[in-house]
Regions:
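N-terminal active-site segment of His-dependent metallophosphoesterases
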Residues: 1-70, 160
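Beta-strand-turn-beta hairpins that frame and shape the catalytic cleft
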Residues: 3-13, 106-116, 141-148, 201-207, ...
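Binuclear metal-dependent phosphoesterase catalytic core
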Residues: 5, 179, 201-243
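Acidic/histidine-rich helix-loop elements
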Residues: 12-35, 60-61, 91-101, 123-131, ...
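Active-site neighborhood of phospho(di)ester-bond hydrolases with catalytic His/Asp-centered motifs
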Residues: 13-15, 52-58, 82-88, 118, ...
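Metal-dependent catalytic neighborhoods of phosphoester/phosphodiester hydrolases
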Residues: 23-25, 55-76, 91-103, 127, ...
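His/acidic metal-ligating clusters that form di-metal
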Residues: 38-52, 127-206
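Short, electropositive alpha-helical surface patch
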Residues: 65-81, 168-177, 204-213
């Protein structure tokens, strides 16, 4: 689907909202519902022209229908297109994602295309992008060879130098990068899961993780530890020239 043909596009990445089944309940000493709403308010006050939100997983900490329904109701009230991929805490049976979890989905913004991958595996904390999706991804990169590509998934492909979270990274990064290495139109890979900001470059591709809208994890920690950084989000300004 093509959303518009303007020259510049603003995409907001949010991640790891960890919503509870009741909006007053806390997650790790924070009310994730209130924090999520405050982050969104901060975004819309400063960025009046948003083309889409992309949520990179762990919408829910308690993954039941009413949790997801509150998320949907709130996001729909913003009157801005929004998309999401599942995280390890999400439940595909109740998830407000596309029904076919092993199908790769693509959203077009003029010369840019955002590709949504599902790295969540039922019953696992670790991530894995299955062969069916990798094959579809390769077909998409071939079909849209003239497009600038952004890929979004939940699990981080590369280590964060944080032992406890790195054991739960994307486990088949080599399979993913083997596909990406064949094409020169992939510009950005977005992920969540790690509750912190990070950046690295690989073969000219920018890999970003984004802060959670709830609690943050302490960087470079061998053991689970929280950080005092505030909740956050990522802004992508996509230009016609591919920058």
């Amino acid at each position: 689907m093509t959303l518009n043909n303007e020259k510049n596009w603003t995409i907001i990445q949010i991640s790891d909202t960890h919503l509870m089944d009741q909006d007053h309940l806390e997650f790790v000493r924070m009310n994730p519902e209130q924090s999520f709403h405050h982050v969104i308010q901060h975004i819309v006050e400063r960025h009046p022209q948003i083309d889409a939100f992309v949520h990179t997983g762990d919408l829910a900490q308690v993954p039941v229908p009413r949790t997801y329904q509150r998320y949907l109701d709130f996001m729909q009230s913003l009157k801005t297109p929004f998309y999401q991929v599942p995280g390890n805490h999400d439940n595909a049976e109740h998830f407000p994602f596309h029904q076919q979890q092993n199908k790769v989905h693509v959203i077009h913004f003029g010369p840019w295309s955002v590709v949504l991958l599902n790295s969540a595996v039922k019953g696992k904390i670790d991530g894995w992008v299955d062969e069916a999706q990798l094959n579809q991804l390769e077909q998409i990169l071939q079909e849209f060879a003239q497009q600038h590509i952004v890929i979004a998934c939940h699990h981080h492909p590369f280590e964060m130098q944080s032992k406890w979270i790195d054991q739960h990274k994307l486990k088949n990064t080599q399979d993913l990068t083997a596909v990406l290495a064949k094409y020169h139109n992939v510009k950005i890979v977005l992920s969540g899961h790690v509750h912190q900001e990070s950046w690295r470059e690989w073969h000219g591709i920018q890999f970003y993780s984004t802060p959670s809208t709830s609690v943050q994890f302490k960087p470079l920690s061998d053991h689970f530890a929280l950080d005092e950084q505030a909740p956050g989000y990522r802004i992508l300004q996509l230009n016609t020239d591919g920058s």
